[in-house]
Swiss-Prot record:
Primary location: secreted
InterPro entries to which the protein is assigned, alphabetical: Nucleotide-bd_a/b_plait_sf, RBD_domain_sf, RRM2_NsCP33-like, RRM_dom, SLIRP/GR-RBP-like
Name assigned to this protein: Small RNA binding protein 1
Extent of Gly residues compositional bias: 87-160
The RRM domain, residue ranges: 8-86
CDD domains attached to this UniProt entry: RRM2_NsCP33_like (cd21608)
One Gene Ontology cellular component: extracellular space
Family (UniProt): Belongs to the GR-RBP family.
């Protein structure tokens, strides 16, 4: 089975900083065969952003995992598990990649917003510049996290 356009992927949020892809896969593998388990990390620091994705081979396995693991304690943290939204096809986002500045502007290290993130071009993805890096700004696959007029790609630039 080459690359299928159908994915059975869960979003897993609220993860402990210590949770890695291997422990995520181990926790979810009891529900079915896993294609991929991935913790999303910050591009600049390499630190976990506190969320990840688990992709199952079969839909039934994904549904079982969502039902059983949502609200479950993993590595000392109460996690949230939902069906992941499909990535945007890249259209509509252009060069803006996630709405510009995002949330925080205090030098907290996450001032780049979602940086495109999951959710694709133009959307806030999972970013939003929050301390944990998810659930803020545009939210889960949400709208734009821009300042006023809708960003603008080349205007203002990124805060580094």
């Amino acid at each position: 089975m080459a690359s299928s356009s159908v994915e059975f992927r869960c979003f897993v949020g609220g993860l402990a900083w210590a949770t890695d892809s291997n422990s995520l896969e181990k926790a979810f593998s009891v529900y079915g065969e896993i294609v991929e388990a991935k913790i999303v990390s910050d591009r600049e620091t390499g630190r976990s952003r506190g969320f990840g994705f688990v992709t199952f081979l079969e839909e039934e396995a994904m549904r079982s995992a969502i039902e059983a693991m949502n609200g479950h304690i993993l590595d000392g943290r109460n996690i949230t598990v939902n069906e992941a939204q499909q990535r945007g096809g890249g259209g509509g986002g252009g060069y803006n990649r996630g709405g510009g500045y995002g949330g925080r502007r205090d030098g907290g290290g996450f001032s780049r917003g979602g940086g495109g993130g999951y959710g694709g071009g133009g959307g806030g993805g999972y970013g939003g510049g929050r301390d944990r890096g998810y659930g803020g700004g545009g939210g889960y696959g949400g709208g734009r996290d821009s300042r006023g007029s809708g960003g603008g790609g080349s205007e203002g630039g990124w805060r580094n």
